[in-house]
Each structure stands twice: as C-alpha cells, then as structure tokens.
Amino acid sequence: MDPQGIVKAFPKRKKSHADLSSKALAKIPKREVGEARGWLSSLRAHIMPAGIGRARAELFEKQIIHHGGQVCSAQAPGVTHIVVDEDMDYERALRLLRLPQLPPGAQLVKSTWLSLCLQEGRLTDTEGFSLPMPKRSLDEPQPSKSGQDASAPGTQRDLPRTTLSLSPPHTRAVSPPPTAEKPSRTQAQLSSEDETSDGEGPQVSSADLQALITGHYPTPPEEDGGPDPAPEALDKWVCAQPSSQKATNYNLHITEKLEVLAKAYSVQGDKWRALGYAKAINALKSFHKPVSSYQEACSIPGIGKRMAEKVMEILESGHLRKLDHISDSVPVLELFSNIWGAGTKTAQMWYHQGFRNLEDLQSLGSLTAQQAIGLKHYDDFLDRMPREEAAEIEQTVRISAQAFNPGLLCVACGSYRRGKMTCGDVDVLITHPDGRSHRGIFSCLLDSLRQQGFLTDDLVSQEENGQQQKYLGVCRLPGPGKRHRRLDIIVVPYCEFACALLYFTGSAHFNRSMRALAKTKGMSLSEHALSAAVVRNSQGVKVGPGQVLPTPTEKDVFKHLGLPYREPAERDW
C-alpha cells in the first residue's frame, strides 16, 4: 500500500460505541490501593491478549484489581471468567490457551462484557456475552449456563459494543476465521517461522501459512502416509509455483478496502486481526471469480462468517462502515512506524506522549541514533529507487570489494535479483569460493566505502549472525540530486552462500513457504543451512540441530526439498 494511502483513507473518524467505554473509564475516580472498591471481589479472571492487545489487556487487569477482583492464569484453580476478544471463537480460544476444555466453573466471555461491567460499576449477567460452544461439544459438561442459549440462532442479544481502551481507542474488527468452520486447519500442527528467526516458531501452522499466501488450505495427509507431501500436495505450496502464475484478482473492489483495515490493525500492533485480514485478503485474491453471495464467500477457505458479512456489505453498498470508525491515531501511527528503527510499539509510545507529526518528533522527541537517521532521511527511504540506481550501488560495492580480492563474489539480492523495476533498498551478499578469503574483508570494505563518501550513515556497524557479518547503513551515489538509500552488506562463508542467497533474495512469502515445507519433511531451513533429521518436540519447536545437507547451489536446496527450481524472478510472491 502507498505509505500515504492510509492517511487519505481516514480523513475523519465518526464517533463509535467504542468511545463510550473510554468516557466511562475517564469518569472512574482514581483511588489508592487500600480504597479500592470490592464489587469485583467475586471475580477471578484471566485476560487473553490475543485480539484484545497487550496494552488493553493490561488496562483491564489493572481495573479488575482496582475494584477488588483477582487476575490469574487460565489454568489457575477457581478461575471464574476467561475474557477474550469479542470476535474470538470457542475452539480457537481453547487452542490458544492450550486447554482441552474449560476449567470447572469457568466461563468464556467476550471483552465487551467486562467493559459493560466497568461502565456500570457492577457485575452484569453474562447472557449474550458467553462464547457459543461448537455443536459437537454440547454433550460435554460446560460451566457456562448461557452456552447453549448463546449457540442457538437468534438468541444472542444485539447489545451496543463498548470497549475499554487506551488512547488511541481500540477499534473492533474481524478476527481470523473460526477453526470450527475449517476442519483441515486442525490437522496441521507444524509451524512456520518468523522471517527473522532461525526457522523455528510455534505460532502459525503450515496450513495457515498456505491460506495466508494462496488462499487454499492444504489437503490433510493420510494417517498412514509418509512425511513427504505427495506431488499434488506440493502444487499447493507457494514455493512450488512460479509467481508469474499469480491468479487474477477478480475481487479487487473488496480486497482494496480490506487491505486498508489490515494496515490499520498492523500499525496499531494488533497482529492477530492483521493476520486474519491478510488471510481473507489472499483467499479473495486467489478466488477464481468475483464473489457474488454470502454463501459463496463463506465457502472460501480462509473466510469466516463475520468476514463474509463484511464482504457482502462491500458488495451491496460499495463501502465498509468500519472504515468510518478507525481511530484518528492510525495515520499518525503509520507515519511514525515508517521511520527506520521505529516499530509499532515505539510509534504508539510517541503517540501517547502527544506527538502528532514528524516536525514535533524531530524537535522534542527522544530518539535513538538509528531513529534520528531514519527521520533525517525519511522521504528518501520511502522513495523506491529505479532498478538502474540499485545496479550502480551494487557495482560500487563490488568494485571496492574486488579491489582487495578479485575473486570475491558480490551479488545484489532482494527485489533487484527478483527482477523488479524498483527497489526499496539494496542487499549485497559477499563471499569467496575458496571458503577462506572472505575473512577480514568486512572492515576493510566498509572503511574504503566511507573514505569514498559513499557510506553516509551507519545504522548497525556490525551484526554478528553465526559466521555471517552484516552491515546496515545508508549510502548515496555521487552526483547532483542523488538520494540517500538503504544498503545492507552481508559477508558469508561459501558453505552458507546458497542458503543465504535464497534467503536474502526472497520474497518473504516465498521464504516462509520454503521453510514450512522443509518442516513437514523433518528438515530445517535458514539463511545458514538446510538440515535433515531435525528433532522437534510436540509443539514443533526444534530441540536437535539435525544433519547439515550439502547445498553448494540454490538448485541443491530445491532438490533436497523435492521442488522444481525457481528462478529468482519466479519467487516474487
């Protein structure tokens, strides 16, 4: 999305029901701990942050304690209420809590119930706020007296949504689709990795990953089958498909509005909603024709009932009302989060400190050295450079490196190697085929580039990553009108060159798909190596390193994974 697009998307924000709880909270008089009221003394609650957000969850916890209640874990004896986001579903809540069923006497309630209690100053009835149980679970004993009523059609009350939120007010949105509607999601327990990890992360299943990228959940493997996916199953993986075969987006008029919301939740740090929207967006982009009905939307893997309602609202009215209720903070948070070195948490901190524009931040804000550089070159960093400029930057680094040793290999990776016409930054990978001569080149090269005036600012002078050395900085080509550009220089041993080349070429989606596929084969893929016979625990976390496989070229990585080789231009997912 255009960095300025979200600012244009939210010129004004209408009052929403979510504002009511903020006003209600403002009316609650501050008291000393010893003076805390006891009207929540019978409440022993656990607040689940997923969807609610950590900052808002902590605010809930403070108010519970302030009014005499107790905060505990979901597994604690005597827990009475487990408070979840109002768009959470029953099975997903249990899965995130890692509970086979609710503890005896506990109720699973929506956060709007707690907001209403705090607004009215009393414990209100949970009817209409309890999460409905899946039909197959109704024969199991459940402590919530309203569970069956809530699951019956038409019995939930349509109450005003009230939320207890920090400034900026937390906006309501659709969560990732309920797993009860997609049985195949529960079959895959293998997890994909975060882009910056070593390839081991238990948060997102490979099934979720494929739906996120292609809109299609994988076919569950046969119970007696081997670990290797069948050829037809491989076709479902992004890494097995050329990006040139991306499906035509027949639902652009829907996805462009959902993308605005996804971006809004992302800059607010609400990763669960952002992920839910991302999965739905990619599912819609991959659908083979324009969506025309609610039933058709519900039939698409990755689209839940609530998301289908949003799709129909856009189809029927050409608009999505949620866009009118996004917090005023969103364009400011995006403005701040575009500063290099500032993530969503830092952007939120600056917003809460009262900053609303870059000028105020520059004159009054407390910035790290890296953030100050990012702010100084704010416009240059956001401006994508033409491919020809990226080639000049690579050539400058290569000439300087080969002046020390002509045998050094220097390759520009990222979007440049994938053949894109514009690039956000330049990543130059350096190695030597003899496996030794790359040593010592790192510092000499940086000194040379600084003396030439090519490097203007250092963001991270040296980042050690195993045997790899990485420099993150700013460069500028000589000549009038040249802009400052982001440049990363990575020196790697030749034994890791192929995996590093694959990793730094990307795209990020393609890499995640490769690593998730490796996991299904009992392997582990990172920027350092491809390993086989990797030992993992029941949660999918790697507990044994396995055996490093020989990968002299990228083609060997694909071959070990049973994939056809994809040229860099075919990896642009």
Curated annotation (Swiss-Prot):
Residue ranges of every copy of the BRCT domain listed in the record: 35-131
Active-site residue list: K310 (schiff-base intermediate with dna)
Known catalytic reactions: DNA(n) + a 2'-deoxyribonucleoside 5'-triphosphate = DNA(n+1) + diphosphate
Residues annotated to bind Mn(2+): D425, D427, D488
Gene Ontology CC annotation, any one: nucleoplasm
GO biological process: base-excision repair, gap-filling; DNA replication; double-strand break repair via homologous recombination; double-strand break repair via nonhomologous end joining; nucleotide-excision repair
Region described as Involved in primer binding: 418-427
Entry's family note: Belongs to the DNA polymerase type-X family.
Entry protein name: DNA polymerase lambda
Organism, as annotated: Mus musculus (Mouse)
Species lineage: Eukaryota, Metazoa, Chordata, Craniata, Vertebrata
Name of the gene this protein is made from: Poll
